[in-house]
């Protein structure tokens, strides 16, 4: 804001969609409050890019009529997701920044009724040449994840994950 007020051109480059867990809305509010003209160039959010690159549809006529994007952590540490609603069938759940709370996410979903056999995947370094997909069942997710290291990852949970080539490659191991 300070640089723009001094007449300089300012670019805020954000990977993905700046309005999906990117704080774009907060930044726009600050610019509007300061009376600074701006332009937002939309990007492709990680959920869309990573799922497509991994061969995981977010929706499917027979498997998931909806998808929901969630932060793995909430701004207020005392806040919580509606786990009962998230455990309902027929949806794909995509958690951004959720790997540090992977155990809690898996436990809460299963405790609220999501089947332990539900397909789940972590897409590491999505859409990059180094992309890796770890696909398994929800009940095995926590045990299998540590072997993949502390890279950035997007967590996808739902029946559409079974369509991923990575899930299909080892269905008995999944």
Roles of regions detected by a PLM:
Residues 2-73:
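Short glycine-cluster motifs
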Residues 5-11, 23, 29, 66, ...:
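A contiguous loop/helix-start segment that scaffolds small-molecule binding in enzyme catalytic cores
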């Amino acid at each position: 804001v300070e640089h723009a007020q001094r007449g300089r051109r300012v670019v805020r480059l954000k990977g993905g969609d700046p309005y999906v867990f990117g704080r774009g809305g907060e930044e726009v509010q600050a610019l509007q409050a300061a009376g600074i003209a701006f332009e937002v160039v939309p990007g492709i959010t990680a959920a869309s890019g990573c799922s497509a690159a991994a061969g995981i549809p977010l929706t499917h006529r027979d498997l998931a009529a909806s998808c929901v994007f969630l932060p793995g952590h909430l701004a207020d540490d005392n806040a919580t997701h509606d786990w009962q609603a998230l455990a309902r069938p027929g949806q794909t759940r995509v958690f951004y920044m959720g790997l540090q709370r992977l155990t809690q996410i898996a436990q809460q979903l299963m405790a609220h009724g999501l089947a332990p056999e539900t397909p789940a995947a972590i897409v590491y370094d999505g859409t990059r040449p180094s992309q890796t997909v770890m696909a398994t069942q929800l009940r095995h997710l926590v045990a299998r994840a540590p072997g993949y290291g502390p890279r950035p990852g997007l967590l996808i949970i739902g029946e559409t994950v079974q369509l991923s080539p990575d899930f299909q490659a080892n269905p008995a191991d999944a």
